Design a protein with these regions (language model features):
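Helix-to-loop junctions at the C-terminal end of transmembrane segments
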Residues: 79-91, 177-178
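Pair of pore-lining "gating" transmembrane helices in MFS-fold secondary transporters
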Residues: 27-47, 125-129
Length: 219
């Protein structure tokens, strides 16, 4: 990872305006994007670490519980294409809201289908696939709202807040499962999706930051 950087020789593109914010102030500049990245990282790392545990504690065999991750991952890969298409032709924040609503719906449905394998796998495919689409839309919004050095700072900020969400996810989900039993896992997932939707509903957060160059008019 370091080797290519040694060949760059401190190269910097010409003609770029200096950024008007840094990683810390990015929270104030684009809070919706920060929350979206944090929520998705929380969901991803909690799922990788605890989704099979949730399955076993709910009565599934270890083999079936392991398959839960497989179908969740397949959904996360396949459904990015239609989600990206919707993001090109419809309101991107609106698509993010739909992904969040499906995140809540999946959390509600999961405990009721846990013992029916085909329904469980279908639910995980759709639920995790659309929930993962939040990051697709977040990247698209970053490209729409920022240019040049500001885009570089935005993407770097994503890495920081992804790391924070990834650290918090297993801890919060594990605590929820200790307190409320196995269903603490979908409860945490639903709560995180709700937080995302709340931020999407705030008009100020739905608009391009004033410091950024707006590339397209689609909100």
């Amino acid at each position: 990872a370091i080797a290519p950087l040694l060949l760059v020789n401190n190269y910097s593109p010409d003609g770029l305006e200096p950024p008007t914010f840094n990683i810390l102030s990015f929270v104030r500049v684009a809070p919706l994007l920060v929350v979206a990245v944090f929520v998705l990282a929380l969901k991803e790392m909690a799922s990788v670490g605890l989704l099979p545990v949730y399955g076993v504690r709910s009565g599934l065999t270890e083999a079936t519980a392991a398959l839960m991750l497989f179908f969740a991952a397949i959904g996360g890969a396949v459904l990015q294409f239609p989600i990206g298409w919707f993001g090109d032709y419809f309101s991107r924040v609106g698509v993010m809201v739909v992904c969040g609503l499906i995140g809540i719906a999946g959390a509600v449905v999961l405990p009721f289908v846990i013992m029916v394998p085909w329904l469980l796998f279908l639910t995980l495919f759709v639920w995790m696939g659309f929930f993962a689409g939040v990051y697709t839309i977040t990247l698209t919004l970053a490209g729409q709202w920022f240019r040049g050095n500001e885009l570089a700072i935005a993407i770097a900020s994503f890495g920081v807040f992804w790391g924070l969400g990834g650290l918090a996810g297993p801890v919060i989900a594990g605590y929820a499962m200790d307190v409320w039993g196995p269903n603490g896992f979908p409860l945490m997932m639903g709560a995180s999706a709700t937080l995302l939707i709340v931020f999407c509903m705030v008009p100020r957060f739905r608009q391009a930051p004033r410091t950024a160059a707006v590339v397209r008019s689609t909100p």
